Design a protein with these regions (language model features):
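Active-site phosphate-binding/coordination module
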Residues: 38-131
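Substrate-recognition "cap/lid" segment bordering the active-site pocket of phosphatases
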Residues: 84, 90-110, 169-197
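A generic structural motif
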Residues: 136-142, 174-178
Length: 253
């Protein structure tokens, strides 16, 4: 059985390739306050080197809104950003973001407003539970809540999503209810095909990253960060371990 080091050594010889990575819990250690999340310093350097390498395309694939992802992620111009679990896409330029436009129908916009109002009712009176509104989704966050508060809030959010949403994603301390059907896997495959990448490296830590692992092929390099069952072929224990692997990939000599 090949090791991750072996797989990355082979990956480094292929062209063109796509290096696609989750943000929270993968490049950036998880934080109680999500606005304090940052890519590890060695990761910032490695991503810049990879992006400057001929035949290498770079992408971040995150559940965060595009605005959050662009604000927090220190990535070079040319990097593709896929936000909201595939519902938003943009490319970083020297002047900001070149965005793909997300257009909701009147019905979807009304449903999003209703979801937001009902999600706020779920959070009301529950310490540590808060609601984020994205362009295509509503997210109930429970990271700061005690377990006995978080569980019923998540259960109610899931039930709300099953009633009114087009898709429900239950990740680490979050329930996201979208009015558009999208997944990291679909978005990643679309980007790979658009770029004509011969092989993809994808790493992620959450259950939502399993969609990407499952969508990729046997020649692609899929890496689970942390514990838990996974469809990924390889595993590392922490963002620090993943960044070390990226440093080696970016500077194989």
């Amino acid at each position: 059985m090949t090791t991750l080091d072996d797989a990355l050594a082979t990956f480094a010889t292929r062209r063109p390739v796509l290096v696609a990575l989750d943000f929270d819990g993968t490049l950036a250690p998880l934080q109680d306050d999500p606005q304090t999340s940052r890519i590890l310093p060695d990761g910032v350097t490695a991503l810049a080197r990879l992006a400057a390498t001929d035949g290498v395309s770079l992408a971040l694939v995150s559940g965060r809104s595009m605005n959050d992802l662009h604000t927090l992620a220190e990535v070079p111009a040319g990097t593709f950003l896929i936000g909201s679990h595939g519902a938003e896409r943009a490319r970083v330029t020297t002047f900001g973001l070149d965005r793909d436009v997300v257009q909701l129908s009147d019905e979807q916009a009304d449903r999003l407003a209703s979801l937001g109002a009902q999600a706020l009712r779920i959070a009301r009176g529950r310490d540590g539970v808060w609601v984020e509104t994205k362009p295509t989704a509503v997210v109930v966050h429970t990271r700061l809540a005690e377990d006995e508060v978080a569980r019923p809030a998540e259960d109610e959010a899931i039930a709300l999503g099953e009633q009114l949403g087009s898709g429900v994603l239950h990740g680490k301390d979050v329930v996201e209810i979208s009015v558009l059907r999208a997944s990291k896997g679909e978005a990643l495959v679309a980007l790979r095909d658009e770029l004509g990448a011969s092989v993809v490296l994808y790493a992620g830590d959450d259950v939502t990253d399993e969609h990407a692992f499952e969508a990729l092929g046997p020649d692609d390099v899929t890496v689970k960060v942390g514990d838990g069952p996974t469809a990924a072929r390889y595993r590392v224990g922490s963002p620090q371990e993943l960044v070390a692997a990226l440093v080696a990939l970016a500077d194989p000599h």
